[in-house]
UniProtKB/Swiss-Prot annotation:
Annotated InterPro entries: ACP_syn_III_C (IPR013747), ACP_syn_III_N (IPR013751), FabH (IPR004655), Thiolase-like (IPR016039)
Organism: Variovorax paradoxus (strain S110)
Domain notes: The last Arg residue of the ACP-binding site is essential for the weak association between ACP/AcpP and FabH.
Main location: cytoplasm
Name of this chain's protein: Beta-ketoacyl-[acyl-carrier-protein] synthase III
Ranges where the record places region ACP-binding: 253-257
Catalytic activity: malonyl-[ACP] + acetyl-CoA + H(+) = 3-oxobutanoyl-[ACP] + CO2 + CoA
Active site annotation, chain numbering: C119, H252, N282
GO biological process: fatty acid biosynthetic process; secondary metabolite biosynthetic process
Record's GO cellular component terms: cytoplasm
Subunit composition and interactions: Homodimer.
Length: 325
């Protein structure tokens, strides 16, 4: 039995429709909501995001990202013996988007389930897949983050609707004799539920509450920078590493100020920070694998380098994974 797991392929997918800040400002103006490219960029670092067509689901985006990851790993769908999808925007209440993705891949039999930790979801899912491989439950896992967050945005709230986008990212994680996933550190604190949530739910066929995203931006910012530093340091300690061992930091792509603040806390130069939030916006559980895939395919992040992944999201949830690519 192999003692470790390692990422052997990455993939991602963005819906074709790219929405710039100017595009969004024009759309919001028809609702009487004022914003601008300058206002958005200064506060978030976001210039554009992608929105899926109304008929496109999270599993549709996941399928494209999965195909790219499988190709990069030199694997076929039939080789996969575990599928985990991290999403907060599933196709249905049930079954899981992972089960739907499994069917779209044309395979059956292996375990398939969703993980819901919002923007920390991919870090959670990767940690679960690593544990299952280490215990021999799986040998070749497909781990996906996929979201259609545009469906749950309040376009009358300029402080939130400008932040998010749709997309998917995926990795193939395989059993390995050499260390890949070095350590992880996961946390949640339910007393912060109200600062980032979608408080509505369905009961008796009716929507109760508000089925749109609510966020206290200042509270999220203050908490995020602190807990991300703590998780990163805990993960390094578990792996017997220091900040100097990190070649690249790939945080959840939420807001450039949070990302730069975290890098500064870890004494990492800006050059070691992977940034895609400028073009993708916040894609929740998809943001980390999207950024990882873009960094790998551009040649920036290379095989053998040490990468810190960090996620923080509603719940409040947060965590980190340190890996050798």
């Amino acid at each position: 039995m192999s003692s470790y797991s390692r990422i052997t392929g990455t993939g991602s997918y963005l819906p074709p429709r790219r929405v710039t800040n100017d595009d969004l400002a024009k759309e919001l103006a028809t609702r009487g909501i004022e914003t601008s490219d300058q206002w958005i960029v200064e506060r978030t670092g976001i210039h554009a995001r992608h929105f899926a067509a109304p008929e496109v689901t999270s599993s549709d985006l996941a399928l494209e990202a999965a195909r790219h990851a499988l190709e990069a790993a030199g694997r076929k769908a039939e080789d996969i013996d575990l599928i985990i999808v991290a999403t907060s925007t599933p196709d249905m209440v049930f079954p899981s988007s992972a089960a739907i993705l499994q069917n779209k891949l044309g395979v059956a039999g292996c375990p398939a389930f969703d993980v819901q930790a919002v923007c920390s979801g991919f870090v959670y899912a990767l940690t679960v897949a690593d544990a299952m491989i280490r215990t021999g439950t799986a040998r070749c896992a497909l781990v996906v983050g996929a979201e259609v967050f545009s469906r749950i945005l309040d376009f009358n709230d300029r402080t939130t609707c400008v932040l998010f986008g749709d997309g998917a990212g995926a990795v193939v994680l395989e059993a390995s004799e050499e260390p890949g996933i070095l350590a992880s550190d996961l946390h949640a604190d339910g007393k912060h539920v109200g600062i980032l949530c979608v408080p509505g739910h369905v009961s008796g066929g009716n929507v109760l509450g508000t089925p749109l995203l609510h966020m206290d931006g200042q509270a999220v910012f203050k908490l995020a920078v602190r807990v991300l530093e703590d998780a990163a340091r805990a993960t390094l300690a578990k792996a017997g590493k220091t900040e100097a061992d990190i070649d690249w930091l790939i945080p959840h792509q939420a807001n450039i100020r949070i990302m730069e603040g975290t890098a500064k806390k870890l004494k990492l130069p800006r050059e070691k920070l992977i940034v895609t939030v400028n073009e993708h916006g916040n894609t929740s559980a998809a943001s980390i694998p999207l950024a990882l895939d873009e960094a790998v395919r551009s040649g920036k992040v290379k095989k053998g380098e040490t990468v810190m992944l960090e996620g923080v999201g509603g719940g409040f949830t947060w965590g980190a994974v340190l890996l050798n690519l």
